[in-house]
Each structure stands twice: as C-alpha cells, then as structure tokens.
Amino acid sequence: MSSPVSRWTLRLSVLIAAIVVLVLFGLSRSIIGQAPVPFRSPPPGSPPAKIRAYGEFAGCPEEPALFHRCAQEKAKTFVPPRTPDGKPDFQGFWNRIGIRNLENIEEHPESLDGSGGRSSIVDPADGRIPYQRWAAAKRDAHFEKYLDAGQYCLPDGAPRFLWGATKFVVQTPGYVFMLNDYADTYRIIPTDGRPHIGPKIRLWQGDLRGRWEGNTLVVDATNQLAETTLDHIGNFISPDAKVVERLTMIDKDVIYITTTIEDAKVFTRPWTVAFGWRRNPNPKYESWEQGCWEGVQSSLKYTDEGRKRSHGAFEK
C-alpha cells in the first residue's frame, strides 16, 4: 500500500503535468492567432503582401489606389452617352472590376481565387479602416470566425450593395433602379430632390436619395436597418452610418465609383473606398433569380471554404 506522501506526490505530478499541457496549448493558440491569416489584414508596418499582378480597364490599372488616381483624370474629359432626358446613361449589366476585396476590403495576402488584394481604401492613405479601439477588437473577433452575413443570405446593405458582382441598371426621369444578382435585392433611388424619410424608419439598403452633379450620380444612404458587414471576413458599420456613393462614367464600358463612410459610433474619422464597374460584354446576358435563404447549401459551401483557410474559424 502506498504511503500518503507518495499519493500526494503523484497527485502533484499529475497537476503539474496538466498545467504544463494547458500552458503549451494556450501558447500554441496564441502563436497560431499571430500567424499570417490568408484573408486578414497584415499588421501596420508590414511590407506589401505578395499578390498576383492586376489587370487594366479603360487604360487604368485595376489596382484600387492606381485605378482611383487614373479614373479621376479620365473623368475630367470623358463625355458619357446620354439618356433622352440628358442624364449620363448608366443603363445595362455591370460587373465589378476585380473581386479581390470581397473577402477583405483592406490589403490581404490571399483571396479565394488565390490572388490576394491591395486595399480598396484610398482615404486614409495607409489603406486602413480607422476603427475606434472597441470596434477594432470586435472586428478582430469577426476575423477569427470568417463572419459574413452572406452565409445567412441577408441583403447587402449600403455600401456593400455596389461592391458585389453583377448589377442591372435602369433609368427613368426622376429615378435610377439597380437590381443585384445576389439575393434578389434591388434599389429604387429617387433623383427628384425629395427629402429623406424620418429617422425612425430603417431599411436594409438605407434610405436612398440621388442627385446629379455634372456627370456624377451621387447617392446618399441613411437609416440603415442593422449592423452591416462590408466583406466576407467581417469588417462592419453600425446602423447609424452615413454613406455617400459617387458613380462617374470614365469610358463607355467603365464606371468609376467611390464610397465614403461616416460613422462616429465605430470610426475615428470618415473614410473612402474606390473601385469600378465594367460593362458585361455579353449581349444575351440574363440575371437569373438566385435561390438564397438561411442555410442554403451553396452559400454554406462558399463561406465554409473561407473558414477552412482562416485560423480560429469554426466548422459547420
């Protein structure tokens, strides 16, 4: 029979071993958490990510910051086609130029197509979202889960509506209509000068009001219904965000777009994203109804692929 001393020695040894295992496990999780994550923004001060080369559209580089500068110059001289009422004619099917920032609107070393992407943020100049400290911590928690409203087939709010894939645009006097190929969402944008609705009414797209400033369509979005994610990885804005979108044609087949977001609850200052649309060249293209609802397998497969490649992400 073992003595009381030997039994206590054994228990102490087991306890010490358990503590060592827990410490090592916690350390490994910490190390993993600090490792480069495919879709996560590199820490401030990191060297530029190694990514696949960008293309070119309408004589402008596809890379967001370069496209932004080039498009600003082209917008000064390009004369767009006109609708019968004299407004720039944006009608037709449009695709986003590049999909590299669907995962993360900031710079990231990898995307689902393997190319990676430079930041689509052109102001501030460092390409970083100017989060308040608490909001940055919440964003980091989203990163660990690859949190995206798309897995629930929730409608894209402003500003993400314009950042997605195919759009169909129709114009009439006093209105611009936009149909999204994702989740059958759409926009009805009055351009007749009417005021915004009351602040107590909240909408998925926000309350939209458009106006023409020369050749540029300016859309103000207020009254967001809920907190909205901006990309697959979980950057976000609050329902009180104010969004200003500016769409300018720089070529008969290219529209240059900027989105400025102001949200005093989440950010330390307003910030701006730049990107573009290119005209769909297929004259027979049709936008089909998308089967999209919470739990639909096609959406789960897409977001699960992102989770598999993100540290800390949960599995289905």
Regions of interest found by a model, annotated:
Residues 1-11:
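N-terminal secretory signal peptides that target proteins for export/translocation
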Residues 9, 13-14, 24-316:
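PEST-like low-complexity, intrinsically disordered acidic/proline/serine-rich tracts
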